[in-house]
């Protein structure tokens, strides 16, 4: 008899717990999404998207604004689908707080190709420019193949790491199969040729400028070969 009583007691208590759990879950699901925390976690400050844009996407994905109607995976896919977003993590805490951790793409260079402008990030991924925000970076022009993006990323990083190069070179241009560096002095361009041995070429040209070119009339040059400089 005792065992039977104990068994009935366990069933009763379990039933109460299930009822309370279902009741609490129903109340939780009926709550509105009020506490939203958006974090931009990229290593440099960029503003292609902001808190307002993210909240508009949340409203579009969850028009009822009920926690129970919120599809976390669908919302995360919508954020990740934005071309300027590198990655996104969306999660809901037990207290009902909706969290969005977003990493935006950081442009390495700006590409002018076929009368269109794009940004290219450090992974070699291109994405459209923004009408409301501009990020300062090197301009690259010409018929550049996507396969060349990684080497151009390396070239721009080499230039940006050196104060002389960063201040001296203002753009990169592709003509035919060869690349040229635009300078802020004189009327000349620096011929790089193919995208290979980039560090050696940039260092060689810098040495050429410091030991020879600064003592010359730079206006008389139209092209200087960085291949042999």
Predicted regions and their residues:
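Charged, solvent-exposed interaction patches on well-folded alpha/beta domains
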Residues: 1-39, 45-66, 70-81, 86-229
């Amino acid at each position: 008899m005792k065992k039977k009583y104990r068994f009935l007691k366990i069933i009763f208590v379990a039933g109460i717990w299930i009822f309370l759990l279902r009741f609490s879950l129903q109340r939780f699901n009926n709550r509105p999404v009020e506490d939203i925390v958006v974090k931009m976690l990229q290593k440099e400050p960029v503003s292609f998207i902001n808190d307002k844009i993210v909240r508009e996407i949340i409203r579009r994905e969850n028009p009822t604004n009920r926690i129970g109607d919120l599809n976390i995976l669908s919302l995360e896919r919508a954020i990740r689908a934005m071309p300027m977003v590198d990655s996104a993590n969306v999660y809901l805490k037990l207290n009902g707080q909706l969290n969005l951790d977003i990493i935006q793409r950081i442009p390495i260079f700006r590409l002018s190709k076929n009368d269109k402008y794009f940004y290219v990030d450090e992974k070699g991924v291109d994405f459209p420019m923004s009408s409301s925000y501009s990020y300062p970076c090197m301009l690259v022009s010409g018929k550049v193949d996507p396969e060349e993006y990684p080497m151009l990323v390396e070239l721009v990083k080499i230039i940006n790491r050196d104060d002389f190069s960063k201040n001296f070179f203002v753009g990169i241009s592709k003509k035919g199969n060869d690349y040229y560096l635009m300078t802020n002095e004189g009327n000349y361009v620096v011929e790089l040729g193919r995208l290979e041995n980039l560090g050696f070429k940039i260092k060689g040209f810098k040495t050429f400028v410091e030991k020879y070119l600064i003592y010359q009339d730079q206006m008389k040059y139209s092209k200087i070969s960085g291949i042999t400089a």
